[in-house]
C-alpha cells in the first residue's frame, strides 16, 4: 500500500510515521526544501519534530504530483487557512476513489465552512463520497514518539472511515469510526478557541477552578453550536469533543493554550505569533466563531470574549469579569 500526506508540519510528519507502519511507501509533501531534505537524508524533521526518528519508508518531496500519484490514501495536514490553496494546486493529481482525510482543525474565515465542506466546495462531486476527517486528543510529538493515541475518524460513508481506520491502526494508534462529520469537526475547531481562554486564565493566575469552569462551559457552547449545525450531541462527549478539549486546555504542548497564557500575561498577539513556528488555529477560528454566533444566534460567550481579546484588543482580565457578571441562567439554558 502507498499513502500520501500533504503537509510536513509536526502533525503531518507524525501521521506519515503512523502510516508507514502499514504502508510500503509514504510520500510526504512539504513547501520547505530544508525540511524535505532533512527527512530524506537524516530521517528527521528538525524544524518541527527535532530528535524524533522518521521511518525510512517516508519519502518527502516538494512536488505534489510525485506525492499523490498512485496513492491509496491521502491525508491533508495543511493549516486550515492554507487548505483551499493547496487543494486547488493538488486537484489535478488527486487519485480517484481513494479516501481523502483532512486533519486540519479550523473553520474557514469568511465562508464559515468546515474542512470537509471546503473540500466539497473545491473538488468535483466524484471526490465527495471519499472525504473523511480525523480528529481527537493527539499532540504531534507524542504521536510521533509512538505514545498511545486514540482519535475519531468520521465520514458520511462508513466504508471510507473503515478504510482509513484499517490503514492507520497500529499498536500505539487507535481510532473509532463515526458518521457525524459535523460534530467531529466543530469539536475539533472550537476547542482551540476555548483553549486560548483556558490559557488566559492560567496566564492570569486564576487557578484550577477557573480552568475547570472554562472547559465545562466551553464544551456547552461548542455543543450548542454543533447541534444547531446538525451534530449528534453525544459526539461532543467523545474523543473529538471532550477528549480533545481537555487535552488542548491543559497540555503543556498545546499551542493554543500557549497563546492564551501569553495574552493573559499581557503580551500582544502579533508578538506571540511571531515567536511561534507553527499555527495556533484558534486565533483565526475565534473570528469564524464570532461570525457564526452572529449568523446563528447561538450564544458563544467564551468564544466571543476570545474574539474580542484577539481581534479587538480587549483586556483579558476585563473579559473574565464580563463573563463572571453575565446575567444568571440555568446550566441547561440553550441546550
Curated annotation (Swiss-Prot):
Its main location: cytoplasm. The active site is at 191 (proton acceptor). GO terms for molecular function: glycerol-3-phosphate dehydrogenase [NAD(P)+] activity; NAD binding. NADPH binds at residues 10-11, 31, 105, 140, 255, 279, 281. It is found in: Cytoplasm. Keywords: Cytoplasm, Lipid biosynthesis, Lipid metabolism, NAD, NADP, Nucleotide-binding, Oxidoreductase, Phospholipid biosynthesis, Phospholipid metabolism. GO terms for biological process: carbohydrate metabolic process; glycerol-3-phosphate biosynthetic process; glycerol-3-phosphate catabolic process; glycerophospholipid metabolic process; phospholipid biosynthetic process. HAMAP family: NAD_Glyc3P_dehydrog. This is Glycerol-3-phosphate dehydrogenase [NAD(P)+]. It comes from Myxococcus xanthus (strain DK1622). The lineage of its organism: Bacteria, Pseudomonadati, Myxococcota, Myxococcia, Myxococcales.
